[in-house]
């Protein structure tokens, strides 16, 4: 008889915990952060330095991109402009107003329009990025990679950085502000 009471209490505790944990988990994954496995060579050596033998898993922060707080050097997950069923992970090279020297895009120089980003893979020869499809709308950004969480040997925070040879030539909006500043 005592066994039956224990079993019922255990079952009730499990069910009540389940009905609390599931909505909390769904909310966290939907609003705050989620994890993604990085496949391919486009972000080497920053991500997946060993190739497919040990793919990196990253924590993607949704909260930081909700209000379009994206900066140069961030690694972001975006919906592919060419295939909306696919998410791609790339580095932000330019933000709105920046002039970018492209790598094989139809125009040699591009001004990133308002509400857009210029994204590129770190491994230029193996990346399908803005050099192929142009600037990307901020609305396509799903998250900013904040940490590598797998494999354990690579646990680390991901800091924003832009390779020196890929920095924007000029930010048109900032140059206009400097030109007309009355200080």
From Swiss-Prot:
Listed EC numbers: 3.4.21.-
Residues at the catalytic site: 42, 90
Native organism taxonomy: Eukaryota, Metazoa, Chordata, Craniata, Vertebrata
Cited CDD domains: S26_SPase_I
Subcellular location: Mitochondrion inner membrane
Bias kind Basic and acidic residues: ranges: 164-183
UniProt keywords, alphabetically: Hydrolase, Membrane, Mitochondrion, Mitochondrion inner membrane, Protease, Transmembrane, Transmembrane helix
Stretches for region Disordered: 161-183
Identification of the protein by name: Mitochondrial inner membrane protease subunit 2
Membrane topology, from the record: Single-pass membrane protein
Subunit relationships: Heterodimer of 2 subunits, IMMPL1 and IMMPL2.
Native source organism of the sequence: Danio rerio
A GO cellular-component term linked to this record: mitochondrial inner membrane peptidase complex
Database matches in PANTHER family: MITOCHONDRIAL INNER MEMBRANE PROTEASE SUBUNIT 2
